[in-house]
Every structure is written in C-alpha cells, then in structure tokens.
C-alpha cells in the first residue's frame, strides 16, 4: 500500500460519506469497506486486502462475485436493445418466464417481473387483495419482507417501529415460538403454532383474509426454523378458508437452502412466490412474482392492475437467464446442500471449543450461529432489538471478524453464515477459523 493508494481509498470513502445515504445506519461513524472488485467468495479493497464474503453480500450473490458469464450476457443484450416498454416483448423475457415455469412446482407458470424483492412483495399483496376481494394479510412476527411501506408493515421486524404510526393498514401478525427456546418439545410446538394461527383466523374472520405471507425459510430474523410439518398445516388451513398462501423466497430462493426454493424443503406448493436476490445474484436489480394459472386466468379478460416502468427489463432478464443456467451448469444447488451439511459438522466441533455458542441453525447455506451468555439459561449475548449499549460484545465480535478479513452479517446475538453457493470445504474452513477467533471475545462474557 502506497501513498497514492491511501489517497484514492480515502477519497472514495469520503465521497460516499459526504454525498450518499446508508441504509439502516446512523450516518455518522460508518466505516465501510471500499470494495474494488470481487472474485468468487472474495472481495478486495483498494488497499489489496482480501475479505471472504460469508453472507453473499446480503444473501444474494449466490453464484459468487465477478462471474464473467453474466457480464457477457448483459453486454450481448445491451448490444441488441437495452430497454423496451413492458408492452413490448424480448427473447430474454420469454426465455426467462419459460425457465421459471419449469423450475417452479405445480401450476406456478406466470411471471410478473419487478425491480427488487420489495416490489415483488408489494405486488403479491396487491394481487392477493384484488383476486380474493378481501383485505387482511396475515404474517409472522420475527420476519422480514422488505423496506417499502407495505412490505415493512407486512414484516415483523423491529426496524418498522419507527414508522408504525404511518404503516400500511390491514396486516395481522401471529407468533411462531422459537424452537431453541421452546421447553415442551417440537410436537407440542407444532400443535400450539397451528392452534394459534387458527384462533387468529377465527378472530379476524376468515372471509376477511386475503393471504398468509411467510418466508420460505427464515433469514435475517435469525434463521428461525418452522416446526416439522408446519407449512403443510398452514397450506391446509388456507385451502379450507379460500386464503391464498404467498411464499417470500427473496432470500431463501435459488439454491440457498439446497433446493430451488426454501418451501420445497416442506413439500408444499403456494399460490404465489415472491423472488429477487438470487434471480440475478445482485449483478443487476431485479425481482419477480410467480403466480398460479388459476390466479392468472382471472385476468385473461380483465385488466391486470399491475405495472412498473422497468418490468421485464431486457438486460435484467438476460442476466437472470444466464444466472439460472449457471446454477445448473455449476451444480450450485447440490453444492449448497452438501456444504450445508459440512457446516453443520464443523460448527458442532466449534461448539466444543466455545462456551458462547448456544445454537446453530441452517438450511443448506442459509444459517447463523447464536451466541449466548449461558447455555443453560440460553440468555442471548445481545437481546432481541438490542439497544446500542447492549451490543457492545457483539460489536467487538463483528469488528474482529472484519479485521481478520471477513465480511458477514452480524445482528443482535447472531453471526450469519451464508456464503456463495460456489464455496468449497477449504473456504468454509478458512471462514470458520476467522469466526472462531472472533468468538473468543464472546467466550469471555459467558457465565
């Protein structure tokens, strides 16, 4: 690193701090990594330091960074046409719709293309209400569905508290207890969770409820697993009352859990799927809402009241077509399942070394380590929706992780482990060695 490099890095960081806003952050005191380029599971800053990316950006860069095949596909499309109105069609749009229909189960054969995950969720909510003529949407506490107004109201994440007074109406939340802290066994948890949902539906009036919206697998709330058989029960309840089931696969979709979609681990078929992140792996902003033939048929002779200027953007569609091809060509979904099993084995070994590791929850390569102060009481190292002074230990752990050359998502008492699907055993070992060293800080606060 020389003086010119330091000067360049400082200028890049300062321009970003001076002229841009950072999401979910206090704007003072931010210390971002100035990323120059990425390759596979690694990011490189302007000083030449390498970071292993153990959260795939924000759980979206599933194929890894810097894949030239996506660049080439984007260039080819831009050399033909970069934009057409959604009223026109392109080869990329049709190819993508056809491929998505092939990989989605059941009769989920129609795609409405959006610009991100939140817009996929917003349009799912809108369409569910229009299709059913009902107004209420049921969602889970401790969930996240995006940061737009409707998506944030739908979520059960505490980041919405600051805008609760202005939130979109008619979202009803229900609780699903956390298995790690449930004292009465998984079978009883399933019974209680199902009974609770049935009570809420009865209290709210089933004829008022348009849809139940759930994540395919829990992500940023802490990878909180559904009890075995839960989603099948929810599917049956929805069928009984004419309620639609919407699965949010924005984070858990596209191989992240070892299957194309997280809900496929539960052997169900929803009525709609919201997707984004892994659809283009962050190479371009893009999203999609897949709907059943039954829902789509309602609009054969009636106007579909959905629209976006950038819907079915040709360049984004081309990137998505190539991305889906890479999943298959590189066997990434199979690798996610295999590496997920390997991670389970290795974290179990880490538990023997670190008294602060309370639990590890994953499905494929969507997982997190939960740190605790006491394994017997399961007191978390930082509480739910922790205040700044309650995050001191975890902030020190996060700082050490970054110092040692890792980028990952640390939230409350969770350290997320969600590397790109191309990750190898050797790279997992490299990443876990960094996490292990950082966790020694937390070990000092156990009792």
Identify the role of each PLM range.
Residues 2-447:
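Conserved N-terminal phosphate-binding loop of PLP-dependent enzymes in the Aspartate aminotransferase
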């Amino acid at each position: 690193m020389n003086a010119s490099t330091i000067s360049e890095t400082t200028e890049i960081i300062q321009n970003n701090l001076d002229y841009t806003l950072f999401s979910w952050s206090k704007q003072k005191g931010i210390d971002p990594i100035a990323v120059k380029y990425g390759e596979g599971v690694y990011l490189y800053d302007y000083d030449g330091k390498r970071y292993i990316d153990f959260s795939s950006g924000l759980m979206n860069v599933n194929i890894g960074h810097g894949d030239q095949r996506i660049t080439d596909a984007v260039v080819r499309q831009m050399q033909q046409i970069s934009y057409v109105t959604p009223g026109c069609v392109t080869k990329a749009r049709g190819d993508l719709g056809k491929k998505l229909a092939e990989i989605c189960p059941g009769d989920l054969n129609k795609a409405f293309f959006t610009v991100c995950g939140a817009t996929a969720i917003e349009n799912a909510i809108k369409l569910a209400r229009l299709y059913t003529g009902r107004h209420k949407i049921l969602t889970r506490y401790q969930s996240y569905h995006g940061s737009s107004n409707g998506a944030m109201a739908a979520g059960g994440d505490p980041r919405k508290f600051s805008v609760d007074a202005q939130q979109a109406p008619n979202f009803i939340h229900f609780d699903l207890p956390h298995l790690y802290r449930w004292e009465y066994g998984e079978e009883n948890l399933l019974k209680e969770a199902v009974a609770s949902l049935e009570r809420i539906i009865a209290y709210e009036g089933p004829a008022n409820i348009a849809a139940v919206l759930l994540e395919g697998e829990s992500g940023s709330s802490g990878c909180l697993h559904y009890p075995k058989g839960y989603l099948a029960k929810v599917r049956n309840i929805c069928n009984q009352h004419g309620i639609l089931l919407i699965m949010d696969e924005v984070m858990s979709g596209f191989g992240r859990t070892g299957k194309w979609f997280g809900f496929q681990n539960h052997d169900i078929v929803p009525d709609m799927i919201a997707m984004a992140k892994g659809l283009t792996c962050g190479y371009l902003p893009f999203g999609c809402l897949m709907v059943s033939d039954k829902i789509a048929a309602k609009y054969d002779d009636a106007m579909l009241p959905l629209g976006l200027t950038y819907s079915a953007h040709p360049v984004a569609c081309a990137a998505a077509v190539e991305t889906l091809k890479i999943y298959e060509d590189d066997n990434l979904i199979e690798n996610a399942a295999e590496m997920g099993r390997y991670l389970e084995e290795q974290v179990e070994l880490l538990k023997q070394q670190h008294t602060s590791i309370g639990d590890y929850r994953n499905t494929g390569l969507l997982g997190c380590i939960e740190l605790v102060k006491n394994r017997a009481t399961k007191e978390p190292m930082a509480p739910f929706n922790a205040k700044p002074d309650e995050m001191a230990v975890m902030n020190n752990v996060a700082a050490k992780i970054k110092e040692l050359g890792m980028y990952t998502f640390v939230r409350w008492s969770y350290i997320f482990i969600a590397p790109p699907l191309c990750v190898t055993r050797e790279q997992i070992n490299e990443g876990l060695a960094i996490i292990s060293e950082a966790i020694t800080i937390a070990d000092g606060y156990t009792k």
